[in-house]
Amino acid sequence: MPNEQLRRMDAFTFPSYSFDLSTGEALFDYALTGPDGEQRFTEVITLPLPASPPSDERVATLGRVLELLHVIAGVSYYKTAAPHRLVLPAPLGPSAVALVTAVYTKGLAEYAYRNALPHVLRLRPEVPSGEVTPPVGYDTDGRRPLSAVGGGKDSIVSLEALRRDGLDPLPFSVNPNRVIEAVNVASGLPALAARRRIDPVLFDLNAAGALNGHIPVTAINSLIAVATSVLNGLGPVVMSNERSASDPNLIWDGHQINHQWSKGVEAEGLLRGALEEHAGLTDPYFSLLRQLSELHIARTFARIGGYDDVVTSCNAAFKLRGASDRWCRDCPKCRFVFLALAPFMPRERITRVFGGDLLADPAQLPGYRELLGVDGHKPFECVGEVEESVVALSLLGEQSGWRDAPVVSALIDAVPETAWKTAATSAVFTPGGPSFTPTRYADALGSLTEPARNLPG
């Protein structure tokens, strides 16, 4: 469909969905409609099947989770045209409507900003009238947790906290790549995986110049994880989103623009509320690391060991061909994670992990100046707060093995005095902020995150 026709689309709808219990395959249909006709899409999500048939209670609960997933996953297709009308397929309660509204507005805020589409920030779904049937309900208490794994340090910390405390987690991922599979192997735990197949038509439209941009993919993957958990009779889905995920990148048109919105605490609360209201699930989903800073998580990861040869937080690395290429060493995530880990690892160890020393490369200075708030705004990437970067730099400046590194010495001279004063009183190693983590799980994390006694020097 030509782009000029896409731009005239005035509504996005959800014609139907189906689920085959024998294959675990869900088909989600979507449509953009307008004066020139319609553009249809079908997404296919395949869930791993349980060893024995699920109970009627689980099947009913799964159906309610899939109803939410159908609507939330549509955000990938809505963005090709960004029509002013979002027409939901069935009545929903207020908590579910709040989730949908936020996913299509706050979750698409960066997309709206980059494409100059302020109307997206004010989008309100059209909800059919009618009563919502109360959910059957499903109790996840005492069941084996599903621990989401992305291949980075954060999910490894969560997985190890649960495992070491006897909670017997199952690693989970959507469309696992070689990086995630390597982490699963290193953990020694059996893993579950779901598959998400985006309609190829979407890629064709994108290649032809359709509107495109960042989507709240964590919201989609979270619901896929919850659906997997219910189908397989498992317990809560444990995520590894830290507190800095709630920190916006900038303000535009009176709205916060946050690259990580769907990883933030607001999105977590909305998703939990919708799952309780619509599917009858209590405590089905939470982030174990919510109250920790990125720097706190990095310190904990450095003390775990066993994953140095497989860990990566670099998005570009997922596209690299070489088996040893886990870090591109030239993106905001590589820069930040290197900076966050460096104070807690000997230089030789972190250089081996990354395949190079970013703090010895003067070409990295412009990117590090952004991370430290010296130039520009916080990058549109999953990186920590400016304060955390300054604290990490201050720790490096105190260590003989790091203080003379070219990038470290140059950055120390560039950071303003006010930032140093803030770093001196920083609480980055003090857990804080809102959290939905149940006490049993919070205790498991606490046993792993006790302060380190010695730093490499």
UniProtKB/Swiss-Prot annotation:
Superkingdom, natural source? Bacteria
Give UniProt keywords alphabetically. Cell cycle, Cell division, Cell shape, Cell wall biogenesis/degradation, Isomerase, Peptidoglycan synthesis
Mention one GO molecular function: racemase and epimerase activity, acting on amino acids and derivatives
* Metabolic or biological pathway: Cell wall biogenesis; peptidoglycan biosynthesis
Name the catalysed reactions.
UDP-N-acetyl-alpha-D-muramoyl-L-alanyl-L-glutamate + ATP + H2O = UDP-N-acetyl-alpha-D-muramoyl-L-alanyl-D-glutamate + AMP + diphosphate + H(+)
EC class, as a word, reads: isomerase
What's this protein's function?
Answer: Cell wall formation. Catalyzes epimerization of the terminal L-glutamate in UDP-N-acetyl-alpha-D-muramoyl-L-alanyl-L-glutamate.
Its protein name is UDP-N-acetyl-alpha-D-muramoyl-L-alanyl-L-glutamate epimerase
Q: What is the lineage of its organism?
A: Bacteria, Bacillati, Actinomycetota, Actinomycetes, Micromonosporales
